[in-house]
Each structure stands twice: as C-alpha cells, then as structure tokens.
Amino acid sequence: MPLHPGLENAFKIAMAKTETDVAKLIAEGLLASPQMYANIALLAIRITGTGLAFRSSIGEHVWRDPSLYLNDEFLQRCNGLMVIMDHPETQVLTTEEFKNRAVGSVLLPYIKGDEVWGIAKIYDQDAISEILEGEVSTSPAVVFDQTAGNITLTTENGEPLLIEGVPFLLDHIAIVTKARGSKGVWDKGGDAAGVLLTNNEVSEND
C-alpha cells in the first residue's frame, strides 16, 4: 500500500544521513534553508537567472539564453563552484582574493524554473552570521572570450543590449552583501532574492 505523501516525506527526512541527503531535501523543498549540519550551513542560493536583465552599474541590458544554462552540462560546470562574499575588483579570483573572500562551495546544483540554483556549503561562521541577517542576494562571475559568440546591439532608446553566448569560464558565485547594495543583476530590479532564507529556527547564534 502506498504511503501518505506526508508520511513518505517524514521518512525521507528521518533517513537523511549525510550532507548530500540534507542538500537534496532542501532542493526538493522538504527542508527549509539554511540547515546547520556539523560545522557548515547548507544554504539554497541562486547561481544564475536567465532571460533579460539590466546591469545598472554599466547601463547595459543583457540577454542570457535559457537554453545555454538550463541543462545538465551547465549543472556539471556548477559542481564545486566557489562561493565568495562580494565580487573582487578583478574579473576572476586571484590567490589573494580567494584567501580573503572564499566561504564555501556549491554541493548540489539544480534547475528551478528559469533559474539555476544550488545548495551551498558555507564554512565561514562570520559569513553565515551576515547571511542570516538577510538583505543578501547572489551574483555569478561568468567570463567570455572571443569564441563565446557575444553580440552587442542597440535598443530603441540607444542603450546597449548584450546577447550573451557560451561563457568559457564560470569563476565563482558571490553573495552580494548590504555593503554592495544587497541585490544582484538577476534580481531583475525586484527584491533581493538570490538566497533562500526560510528557516526561522536557525539564528546567527546557532
């Protein structure tokens, strides 16, 4: 006889024995985010959005083709992706910036609607405390070379529109803090929504 869905979910949660098990439950929405596990916080974060967005810092519209990101190949590229606090001034992480900013890595990437999300393992306790205060989002560092196929057009208003191709490097995913305005490009002008904070039982003192 099949189990009642609620009972089946309770069994799944009870049988979670590893950080990967817990990460899968968060991704499925069966556990709230974040979850404290041993010395780490398991946290659902957006790796990238797709479609049309606006980079207000440089006045550029951008189109990120969903077909290039919402697939298994891109998810594989996200495995182990470095999680840092705020972007460095350099386009990619240097040794020094890695030492100063790295706080964890992506354990389990997955597709959520028209976005790519991942469960991150956050080790740095100061970073965990800052994240739990809220008003944070995410911003990916994707790097393009001459073979990427990027095309720049001009909108009717005379503003640049970048049609992105395939990035040759996915360097890191940054947690955008209050000090950097709390929002990422893929919030698309809305509220900061790149970090899922739904677990009211976890406080910065845990």
Regions found by a protein language model. Name each.
Residues M1-E204:
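Signature of dsDNA virion morphogenesis modules
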